[in-house]
Curated annotation (Swiss-Prot):
Keywords: Ribonucleoprotein, Ribosomal protein, RNA-binding, rRNA-binding. This is Large ribosomal subunit protein uL15. Residues 1-35 are annotated as: Disordered. GO terms for molecular function: rRNA binding; structural constituent of ribosome. The keyword Ribosomal protein applies. Transmembrane segments: none annotated.
Length: 156
């Protein structure tokens, strides 16, 4: 990037204060009116009026939200019952799904999902092992002759 001006430091060698007046006037936080957010209700009020929202003073005052720690946040990977029925049909063709008592047994965690939702229709009797399921999904699976079993699982 092209420099548009030469730094004044080069030409101020030996001048002791480099154009900042008395020694100490360019040190610490006194010359700038205080550290950080100091003075926004006093001598820096004009900055609040200029840059803050009218009436609220945002972003200088008030609460500013909350960022949930990653350790407790859950990354949901849902699947609808209609999509699950199609997946089970595909797994049945490949011979990768277990069948017990005329019902297909599916573990959603092994398939990469952790929640069952109620979108779509299901006509296969499926026993689903999942960490979480919606009420409508459970109703649709049971209506088709299947069952939903909630199992504890690590969400991450």
């Amino acid at each position: 990037m092209v420099r548009r001006f030469k730094r004044a430091v080069k030409y101020r060698r030996g001048s002791r204060t480099h154009g900042w007046g008395r020694v100490g006037q360019h040190r610490k936080s006194g010359g700038s009116g205080g550290k950080g957010m100091v003075g926004f209700h006093k001598h820096k009020w004009s900055l609040v009026m200029k840059y803050g929202e009218s009436g609220t003073g945002w972003p200088f005052y008030g609460k500013h939200g909350f960022k949930q720690p990653q350790a407790i946040s859950i990354e949901w990977r849902p699947i609808n019952v209609g999509t699950l029925a199609e997946v089970v049909r595909g797994l049945k063709r490949e011979g990768r799904v277990k069948e017990e008592g005329g019902r297909y047994v599916v573990n959603l965690v092994e398939l990469g999902f952790n929640k069952l939702l109620g979108g779509g229709d299901v006509d296969l009797p499926i026993v689903v092992y999942t960490p979480a399921a919606s009420r409508s999904a459970v109703e649709k699976i049971e209506k088709a002759g299947g069952e939903v079993r909630i199992v504890p699982a690590v969400h991450r």
